[in-house]
Amino acid sequence: MTKHIKILVIGVGVAGPAVAYWLKRFGFSPVLIEKSAAVRKGGQALDIRGIATHIAKEMGIYDQICNMRTQIKCGRYVDVKGNVLHEEQGETFGFRQDDEVEILRGDLVEILMKAIADIPCEFKQSVIKIEQNEDSVTVTYKDGRVENYDLVIAADGIHSATRGMVFSKNEYQLINLGSYVSAFTIPNYLGLDHMELLCESNHKLVTLQSDSQADKAMAGFMFRSKHVLEDIRDEQEQKHFLHASFQNFGWETQNILNRMPESDDFYFDAITQIKMKSWTKGRIALIGDAAYCPSPLSGQGNNLAFVGAYILAGELKKADGDYIQAFTRYNELLHPFVEANQQFGVWVSESFLLKDDEVSKEIAEARSNKILAMIKSVSNSINLPQYE
């Protein structure tokens, strides 16, 4: 029965290809669409942690992830004058333990897409209308084409257009945690060699790292602010806000910002959580950041995507395609795991971005040890069902 169930998956990030993989493996017929012209290269580094590591191994992609993992050998905290405060080895600096690995977002998506090479995927495509009834979901695409599907799974990120089309505003909350994050690539003008530098002061954080591409460096900014942008998606407003927020910050900040116009991969967003009582409505389900973003600072969004994809597809298999039963179980099984990770996301948002008088070697070490312990707990705070 399952092979005749046609499922549209919206979004080629991490959650979309992951759920498509498990749907195909469990006998369904998924198809993917993505509004971008191609898979976005590079991007921020993501962690494969805890139970998600087990899922990656089950998918047969863990060794590929290890082969393409980041290779930061040293992390170094500096003050606004450039003095070294604290130094840690790469894995400890990234809060990774045992067989956990870090990989660039673009590299992970590339691995996932190769794992589902036989699944139809259409780029430069998006949905402008969704209508559902007892028997199917009718989808209208931006090019005017109309298609019917048995189910739709939306994995189109924290600013999910699907969520806005299907769910009313009182069915979800975007919780602003009071901070912003930005990242972009610039030339490796400091000559960093598999190293990350981190400068934290006055509720602001600037990072600079260089890994496998010796001529390039990834700059990162995080900062607290009560200011609300008029248009969170306006890149010029974002860049102006970033400049204004880090004026006279010190260290290499101005040199980094001066090189920002050279970058072609500028990213900026508010540190936000998505809260929903139910991630499903009728024949439509949300997954990944579209459903339960825990906050970019938590580093757990990738793991929620892996676990959510496995459970959603697995419950559909277990229910032999009975989406009502499967969606109910998806919500029941995943909610405690999501809540634990979102609580951790709030804690990280509050514990990072310290005041001037709080930044020290002792504080940095104590915070790292606490984060390591908490990550290990929340990353493994679910017992995965067996569907095969």
From Swiss-Prot:
Cofactor note: Binds 1 FAD per subunit; it is seen bound in two conformations.
EC numbers: 1.14.13.-
Cofactor(s) the protein needs: FAD
Reaction(s) the record says it catalyses: a tetracycline + NADPH + O2 + H(+) = a (1S,10aS)-3-(CONH2)-1-(Me2N)-3,3a,4,6-(HO)4-2,5-dioxo-1H,10aH,11H,11aH-cyclopenta[b]anthracene + CO + NADP(+) + H2O; 7-chlorotetracycline + NADPH + O2 + H(+) = (1S,10S,10aS)-3-(CONH2)-9-Cl-1-(Me2N)-3,3a,4,10-(HO)4-10-Me-2,5-dioxo-1H,10aH,11H,11aH-cyclopenta[b]anthracen-6-olate + CO + NADP(+) + H2O
Enzyme class name: oxidoreductase
Keywords: Antibiotic resistance, FAD, Flavoprotein, NADP, Nucleotide-binding, Oxidoreductase
Activity modulation notes: Inhibited by anhydrotetracycline.
Molecular function GO labels: FAD binding; oxidoreductase activity
Binding site for FAD: 12-15, 34-36, 44-47, 105, 267, 289, 296-302
Bridged cysteine pairs (disulfide): none
GO biological process: response to antibiotic
Short name of any one Pfam family annotated for the protein: FAD_binding_3
Domain remark in the UniProt entry: Consists of an N-terminal FAD-binding domain with a Rossman fold, a substrate-binding domain and a C-terminal helix that bridges the 2 domains close to the antibiotic-binding site. This last helix is flexible, is not found in TetX of Bacteroides species, and may contribute to their different substrate specificities. Binds chlortetracycline in a different orientation (180 degrees rotated on its long axis) compared to tetracycline substrate binding to TetX; binding of chlortetracycline alters conformation FAD and the last helix.
Physiological role: An FAD-requiring monooxygenase active on tetracycline antibiotic and some of its derivatives, which leads to their inactivation. Expression in E.coli confers high resistance to tetracycline and oxytetracycline, does not confer resistance to minocycline or tigecycline. Degrades tetracycline and oxytetracycline; the reaction requires NADPH. Degrades and confers resistance to chlortetracycline.
Family, similarity comment: Belongs to the aromatic-ring hydroxylase family.
NCBIfam families tied to this protein: tet_destruct
PANTHER family attached to this UniProt entry: MONOOXYGENASE, OXIDOREDUCTASE-RELATED
Extra remark: Isolated from a grassland soil sample. Tetracycline antibiotics bind to the ribosomal acceptor site (A-site), preventing binding of the aminoacyl-tRNA to the A-site. The hydrophilic side of tetracycline makes many hydrogen-bonding interactions with oxygen atoms of the ribosome's phosphate backbone.
Protein name, per record: Flavin-dependent monooxygenase
Organism: Unknown prokaryotic organism
Name of the gene: tet(50)
